[in-house]
Amino acid sequence: MNKKLIVTICIALLAAITVITTKLLQNNGIVLNTSTIYTMLTLTILLAICLLNTTIRTKLQHVCCDLDWAEVTSKFYNNIPEIYRKSFWITFGLINVAFLFHTINFMWGGDDWGAVRYATKLKDGLSEGRFSAYWLQELLFNGKILPVINNLWTFAGLALAGILLAYYWNLPKKTSTYVVISLFFAVTPYTLSWLYYAKNTLGNLWLPAFVLSSLILSEKKSENINKSYFYNILAILLCIIALGTYLPIVSFIAIAVIGKVIMGLITSEKTFIQTLQEFTQSLSNLLASFMLFAFIITILQEKSIMANAYNTQLESIFAIFAKLPQMLYSMIEQLILPMPFLDIAYKFFYIIIILTALFTIIFKCNTPKNALTSILLLVLALVCTKLTYLFSIQSLSNPNYVARIDFYSLPLFYTLMLSIVLKLSNPTQYKYTFIFAILIVFMSFVRVAYAQKVWKFGWDAETKLVDRIITRLEKIPEFNINKQYKLVQVGEQSLRKNYYVKRNNEYQSNELLNSAYYKEGKGKEAYNFYYQTDFIKEDASNHAFNDPQIKEYILHNARAWPAKESLAIINDYIIIILNEDRLAQIRATLNR
């Protein structure tokens, strides 16, 4: 019989065995999600192909049976230069200290109740075009959000990103420099904004490490053409994963590349064109990544899998030009605009770093032409901090200043400025700049600690509020613990604000302060979370207000919590009124 036919039959049999085994497991109550089934099937087929190929089978046997993996791992680790190993562990430890309170208390945000109780799924981000948003969570923890270890893995990614950033920008190879640069980037309230979204924390905070790895691999050269292909394919894959997780990462990519170009200009006499020619492969890989990403998005849209979400739907060319003046204004204003835990004094220290970097370039750059080019590139980097605002469709979810989006731009821009000063400094200036950077890092630690305190108090207060709501619900005669209700929650109570000392003219941030843990329209998973039964089957839509009895109650009887009339059970609906202003809005709509 033909050898290829035998191989095909064997693979088909193995695939059939996998499918049958999966069915048997499901019939016996062991439920496997779709991604797990596909993974098992793919691995089975790959294993079959490998085992049937003599060359591959021999190599696998050597890898599995002959190698001492403890020795191989130890050798690989020891081959990493000590400065990188030492810097990573110091940075990793200090980042964990900065966010220790959050890690210990295992907090999450108002969008995470279902994901924490059950797990994230690979398909969850597809409707927004975020096709790789949860793959890392799925790979490491089978989609589950776990206490302590989730944050540890997240901060490992942040620490790695800091080390890779210092390496990519070719900063002085000192442990102190690498650690300070890493902390300068990683420990800020912008980072904390992603910890409000527990289901996104791991995937999104690893993106800088993926992007920097991609850029470094793109520059890696090898005499072995197969290795070169491997490096470039891996670089493109990492970039696609980053884009498919969260598109605003384009700001990070742009600023990182601009920073690399600037570092080349300020330390040599090469022209801008000569410096740019060194990035041919990197730019080619980035272009390939964007094209493949666009191709995937097109397929998702054509198959009606993806909706036009704000983070992937682009503005028209006319709208972009119309937004340019506001974008340029926002680009400057963001440097001085106070936000929760980002007060004006804190931002003033960053402005000092920016001005110092500009003067350092002017007086220390090798040639006046390169100095001018570098300053123009810094302006371009500042423009890139607002790419998401400029190109994406404007919505309530995408105002001018969003802390979680700014995480991919502003901290990196500030770090670029510090890196320029450290790169061009003489020993005396280096020492004073280093001390000043440590002062800013300390201020960041203080603000992050304060934010975590405010978050914990708000979390406890909102949870106790919901306890009181449920206790009162149970006393309503119509309440039946075994019945399934639809929830109508009018408004929400974000109580983090009660523990925060607000300053004048402060721009509000949802993830840092304003968003509630028990959100309007997303109460099902939250209210079921601590209760003995899943008494809420779904969050009711606005169509619920068309019900005559509910409409009558809203217009004439309802009052905001803690009034007795703030709770009602009407047929299959539980109605909770938490905010007077929101109640007034709904009444105005119903009276039209």
Report the location of each language-model feature.
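Membrane-lumen/periplasm interface segments of specific transmembrane helices
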Residues: 279-352
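Intrinsically disordered, polar/acidic, low-complexity terminal segments
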Residues: 31-35, 46, 69, 73-127, ...
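Membrane-interface micro-motifs in multi-pass membrane enzymes
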Residues: 34-37, 126, 130, 154, ...
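Short hydrophobic alpha-helices at membrane interfaces in multi-pass membrane enzymes
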Residues: 217-241, 269-276, 431-435
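Hydrophobic, aromatic-rich transmembrane alpha-helices
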Residues: 163, 344-372
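Signature aromatic-anchored transmembrane alpha helix within multi-pass, membrane-resident enzymes
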Residues: 229-232, 423-448
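Perimembrane helix-loop-helix junctions
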Residues: 252-287
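Membrane-interface alpha helices of multi-pass inner-membrane proteins
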Residues: 230-247, 252-258
